[in-house]
Regions:
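Short helix-boundary/capping micro-motifs
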Residues: 15-31
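A short LG(V/I)-centered, amphipathic sequence patch enriched
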Residues: 45-63
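Alpha-helical linker/hinge and terminal dimerization helices associated
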Residues: 47-48, 68-90, 95-96
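Central regulatory/effector-binding core of bacterial HTH transcription factors
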Residues: 92-153
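Short beta-strand->loop
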Residues: 157-167, 262-277
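Secondary-structure junction motif
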Residues: 188, 192-222
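Hydrophobic hinge/microswitch elements
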Residues: 217-268
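A late-sequence structural motif
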Residues: 247, 269-308
Length: 308
């Protein structure tokens, strides 16, 4: 049996309740009575046959409500897109995108520039962890995200972008101070004492880098997790600067270290790179704006990432 469809008023009301946190605040924003808000939500839950909102403070969507919220936000986006097309010149639209800091620092900004200059589409960029990005895509708060996993998020399409290549590197003065005679005579104890820089406490890529370094040093696998002095720098440019200035060793995107290899101002701690595939997850809706954004992102990735 097919359920009856929600109206535009239903979807607008639902999104407003989530955005403002309470029925009263949503009523004020929409200029209707709180009882009208309550009645619309009640009708929606009757149509769905499920509870869509948790009556907490602030109000939050249930799992079923997350799907409704995504549709509500997509509906609002498509209405704005229609207005933009009808208005013609002078209209613009904003697209919310989550990505990692390294992508923004090395290749994604070209897509942002082209969208703003050529298409009058403006990006609301957010640095989010991949798990949180997935939740925000499901709820419709984000329209797209750069991810390192290909698993399709409900309501979204996924496109392969390319491979981001990183190198384990350090400055020569850092090597002289902490890892003299590196590779030939360096011990695990010396490596454990050598400071490392990480982006934040959710940054686990250094573990993969450490494995490659120990393989090059021909060290036997460690039975215990290794812990080095760690400096946390949640900024891609400042993270790179810390490596350049010999503060710590770190994992840098190829774009941030290629010139330094040519001038011998960075040393590789491993002969093998660390590589991550990147994917473009975006709402699965028929939208000229999102199609344009996807095209610009793919163009930027073509020059900024490896093809395989």
């Amino acid at each position: 049996m097919l359920m009856k469809r929600f109206t535009t008023d239903h979807l607008t009301t639902f999104a407003a309740v989530i955005e403002h946190g309470t029925f009263d605040a949503a009523a004020e924003a929409l200029r209707v009575s709180p009882s009208a808000i309550s009645q619309r939500i009640k009708v929606m839950e009757q149509l769905a046959g499920k509870v869509l909102l948790r009556r907490t403070n602030p109000v939050t969507p249930t799992q079923a409500g997350q799907s409704v919220l995504r549709i509500a936000r997509q509906s609002e986006f498509l209405q704005l897109e229609l207005e933009r097309e009808l208005v013609g010149e002078g209209g613009f639209q904003t697209v919310s995108i989550a990505l990692n800091a390294d992508s923004l620092a090395t290749w994604f900004l070209e897509a942002v520039r082209m969208l703003a200059h050529e298409d009058e589409i403006f990006c609301d960029l957010r640095r989010e962890g991949e798990f949180h990005s997935s939740a925000l895509l499901r709820s419709g708060e984000l329209m797209a995200a750069i991810t390192s996993r290909p698993g399709k998020i409900p309501g979204c399409s996924v496109d392969y972008l390319g491979v981001a290549r990183y190198w384990c590197v350090a400055a020569p003065e850092y090597m002289s101070r902490y890892l003299p005679g590196f590779s030939s005579t360096t011990t695990r104890e010396e490596l454990n004492r050598a400071p490392v820089v990480e982006y934040d406490r959710k940054d686990f890529v250094q573990e993969a880098a450490r494995v490659l370094i120990e393989e090059d040093m021909k060290l036997p696998p460690s039975l215990e997790p290794e812990q080095s002095p760690t400096i946390y720098i949640p900024s891609s440019p400042d993270y790179a600067r810390a490596v350049y200035e010999g503060v710590a060793w770190g994992l840098l995107p190829q774009a941030q270290c290629s010139e330094h290899f040519a001038t011998n101002t960075l040393v590789k701690l491993s002969t093998k790179p660390v590589e991550f595939p990147l994917y473009w997850q975006h709402w699965n809706i028929n939208s000229p704006v999102l199609e344009t954004v996807s095209r610009r992102v793919a163009e930027a990735a073509k020059t900024g990432l490896l093809s395989s």
